[in-house]
Amino acid sequence: MDVVGKFSQMFLALGVFALVFVGALILASLFKGRRGEKVQAGAFVLPALLLLAVGLLYPAVLTILKSFVIDGPGGVGLQNYLDIFTRTENLLVLRNTALWVVLVPLVSTAVGLLYAILVDRARIEAFAKALVFLPMAISMVGASIIWKFVYEFRPNVRPQIGVLNAILKALGLDTQNFLLNGPANTFFLIVVMIWIQAGFAMTVLSAAIKGIPDDIIEAAKLDGVGGFKLFRFVTLPSIRPAVVVVVTTIGIGTLKVFDIVRTMTGGQFDTSVVANEFYNAIFRYNRDGLGSAFAVLLFVLVVPIVVYNIVQMRKDA
């Protein structure tokens, strides 16, 4: 389909949406009283439901159906899912994704929490927080390019422009190709995501810490509770809802990580993750069935985290 055709479809969809919305409002104006209020409420909800159905529900159902279509010879079955969970290269992708999902939320939250506690009520608190939060203002691709220069490797005969290798060379140590040598290269990519997300964790947790009533802190200190015990028995339980939100939010973002891997290694050298393989299957190998299976897997992994987050928020409300 050419560009004109795509734009025509887009404007047609917008026109249909506008007609439905106007028609619903006209219908609502014909009714009065409670019935009219209900119809009017439905008139405002209906367009949103239509958008969800067209933009979310229909593509989701279509993706699930496509995931059972076997690429190549055709047919329907579980072969795409079997490929994901049996082929060596795909098992490596799942392992890498698991490492990302476990390490990034936990380390980012721990670093953000530690930093929030250390700079709390310090003279340079605002400046110190701004330094850690700045990476959040950088796009994933921009952060990846920055860290790619940090990890840059050149043969010993050439001057090192990568920060880490320049330091190693200055210390008389052997330089390393950080993005090539596995499995450590996956951890070097994970560092980039932690660097970005630590600022988010610090901001949310710092606000939660400041929300703890001073009376509780003072009462605990009068009872002889201080230092780590104060953190364990007073601070941490008080900010638990914020910790849950931070961990789950970062976890969801980490499951969908794509930009960092794509920019820094392209998924090569055993660093690929589920989102990157979804892209490769669809756009590089033209395997719509396998790509859809990866997308469904990603959805299945994200849903439990979202549900858990909602349940915890309702409990703490």
Per-region residue spans from a language model:
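Transmembrane alpha-helices
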Residues: 1-34
